[in-house]
Swiss-Prot record:
Cellular component terms (Gene Ontology): cytosolic large ribosomal subunit
UniProt keywords, alphabetically: Ribonucleoprotein, Ribosomal protein, RNA-binding, rRNA-binding, tRNA-binding
Pfam name, any one: Ribosomal_L16
Xref: PROSITE patterns: RIBOSOMAL_L16_1, RIBOSOMAL_L16_2
HAMAP family membership: Ribosomal_uL16
Any single biological process term in GO: translation
Keyword tRNA-binding found: yes
GO molecular function, one term: rRNA binding
Protein known as: Large ribosomal subunit protein uL16
Family: Belongs to the universal ribosomal protein uL16 family.
Assembly information from the UniProt record: Part of the 50S ribosomal subunit.
Name of the coding gene: rplP
Length: 145
């Protein structure tokens, strides 16, 4: 599971997810990527589940880069507790993902294998995604899934 080693504050504000991603919008390390089309919180468990789905389909061939990290703690109050009495205890960790962010990258496998592996990974995530390819001149070409 992905989670930070240390944090300055145990509880943080929820924040707003306005606009599109400004950084991490192109395929940088691998040949193929999975790009988010919606804004959402993605938990460390969802990231790990998507990673396992990809690597199992690829039969541990190729290389996978996870380009999102769950830095943000989220809290939850216990069941059947009245409102008030402070903020709840930390429950888990989430990565804030905005539209346009490339979340996973793959290299070392054919396009058909990469497309299917990323499709399986996208089913584990709470956002709509699309398959993107790396362009030779540095950018990426977008292809809808």
């Amino acid at each position: 599971m992905l989670l930070p080693k240390r944090v300055k504050y145990r509880r943080v504000h929820r924040g707003k997810m306005r606009g599109n991603a400004k950084r991490g919008t192109t395929v940088h390390f691998g040949e193929f990527g999975l790009q988010a089309l919606e804004a959402s919180w993605i938990t460390n468990r969802q990231i790990e589940s998507a990673r396992i789905a990809m690597t199992r389909y690829m039969k541990r061939g190729g290389k996978v880069w996870i380009k999102i990290f769950p830095h943000k703690p989220y809290t939850k109050k216990p069941l059947e507790v009245r409102m008030g009495s402070g903020k709840g205890a930390p429950e888990g960790w989430v990565a804030v993902v905005k539209p346009g962010k490339v979340m996973f990258e793959i290299a070392g496998v054919s396009e058909e294998v990469a497309r299917e592996a990323l499709r399986l990974a996208s089913h584990k995530l709470p956002v709509k995604c699309k398959f993107v390819k790396r362009e030779e001149n540095g950018g990426d070409t977008n292809e809808s899934n």
